[in-house]
């Protein structure tokens, strides 16, 4: 089969979907990440107004991250500073709760946050591949994506702590 771009615009889900460059893969992936974050917001239990407010602030920044490779940069030092502050806030509140590698388990919102966490790691990998292929972008992007993965993890720990959900250690047989 010869895979061709349709002439009918209704049959094209994204203007760049037929590109062979990784840029489109990055954009489709970060679009998925933004959707996953929307799912987290839809599933957040009562009593987490602080987390909801932070996730609502963060939500459009995922689309800023999305458009920052093809378009102009939308992730700035101020965004990194804000995310560092929020990471430190939740990390301090849940200090000492996780000291080992834990299995990703918990209520739906926590599991959706774990999906965001792993999606952020994929974002870092795609940025790395884009960089290797010669695509230029601001160094704030991989820093933000790495921090994002860690932030999502800290939120899972904080939420499970407040809900009194046990963390289950993962005991590796590999290392």
Language-model region placement:
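Phosphate/pyrophosphate-binding loop motifs in nucleotide- or prenyl diphosphate-using proteins
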Residues: 1-175
């Amino acid at each position: 089969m010869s895979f061709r771009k349709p002439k009918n615009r209704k049959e094209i889900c994204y203007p760049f979907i037929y590109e062979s460059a990784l840029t489109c893969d990055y954009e489709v992936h970060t679009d998925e990440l933004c959707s996953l974050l929307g799912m987290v917001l839809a599933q957040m239990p009562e009593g987490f107004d602080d987390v909801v407010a932070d996730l609502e602030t963060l939500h459009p920044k995922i689309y800023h991250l999305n458009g920052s490779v093809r378009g102009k940069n939308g992730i700035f030092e101020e965004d990194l500073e804000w995310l560092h502050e929020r990471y430190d806030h939740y990390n301090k509140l849940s200090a000492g709760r996780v000291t080992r590698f834990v299995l990703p388990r918990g209520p739906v919102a926590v599991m959706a946050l774990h999906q965001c966490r792993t999606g952020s790691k994929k974002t870092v990998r795609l940025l790395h591949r884009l960089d290797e292929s010669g695509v230029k972008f601001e160094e704030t992007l991989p820093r933000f994506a790495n921090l994002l993965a860690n932030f999502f993890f800290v939120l899972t720990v904080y939420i499970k702590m407040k809900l009194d959900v046990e963390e289950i250690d993962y005991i590796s047989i590999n290392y």
